[in-house]
Curated annotation (Swiss-Prot):
Known partners and oligomeric status: Monomer.
Source organism (scientific name): Shewanella loihica (strain ATCC BAA-1088 / PV-4)
Gene: adk
Keyword annotations of the record: ATP-binding, Cytoplasm, Kinase, Nucleotide biosynthesis, Nucleotide-binding, Transferase
Keyword Cytoplasm on entry: yes
Protein name as it appears in the record: Adenylate kinase
């Protein structure tokens, strides 16, 4: 079962990825983890990627596709894999198809931008312990203070509203076109494309995914 997850940052992909991995016994392939592992293992592609990254440049699509192919040939991918965060653009999707990496199911988790902004910009963290709160969904007992220590809570830079909106802008520009791209591939009968309402509870989304992909 070869699955790809699509959705904006903050849509809840990470939670569902965890569920899918456990339910179907497939590994999650995240390009970031894969790059780090290849560099650490010192594979030829890893060494090439290290050279590029050390020079402060972006790793090319070609190199990433090579790493994906190397990764999915490993034993733990025998039953399939879960791609998260790749491909991000149409050229990457084209390159992936051209290199023979097939996908069975594309899962899109759809959450309106304003809901994502509310979810992410409402997060508060206690820096000392890593405890996470949310001003709406999981507020601390005393506003702005950690329940255990009474110390001040902070907003992570990634959760600042301006940062969240910027990341959403990049997503709509680069990755959202993949929704249409894979919709067309699905029409040709080459894979199934399912869109889920990510504003539902985590359990409801997980249940809907199982119903759709079996």
């Amino acid at each position: 079962m070869r699955i790809m997850l699509l959705g904006a940052p903050g849509a809840g992909k990470g939670t569902q990825a965890q569920f899918i991995m456990e339910k179907y016994g497939v590994p999650q392939i995240s390009t970031g983890d894969m790059l780090r592992a290849a560099v650490k293992a010192g594979t030829p592609l890893g060494l090439e990627a290290k050279k590029v990254m050390d020079a402060g440049q972006l790793v090319s699509d070609e190199l990433i596709i090579g790493l994906v192919k190397e990764r999915i040939a490993q034993d733990d991918c025998a039953k399939g894999f879960l791609l998260d965060g790749f491909p991000r653009t149409i050229p990457q999707a084209d390159a992936m198809a051209a290199s023979g990496i097939d996908i069975d199911h594309v899962i899109e988790i759809d959450v309106p931008d304003e809901e994502i902004v509310k979810r992410m910009s409402g997060r508060r963290v206690h820096p000392g312990s890593g405890r996470v709160y949310h001003i709406v969904y999981n507020p601390p007992k005393v506003e702005g203070k950690d329940d255990v220590t009474g110390e001040d809570l902070a907003i992570r830079p990634d959760d600042e509203e301006s940062t969240v909106r910027k990341r959403l802008g990049i997503y709509h520009e680069q990755t959202k076109p993949l929704v249409e791209y894979y919709g067309k591939v699905a029409e040709q009968g080459k894979l199934t494309y399912n869109k889920f309402d990510g504003t539902q509870s985590v359990g409801a989304v997980s249940e809907a995914i199982v119903k759709a992909i079996g």
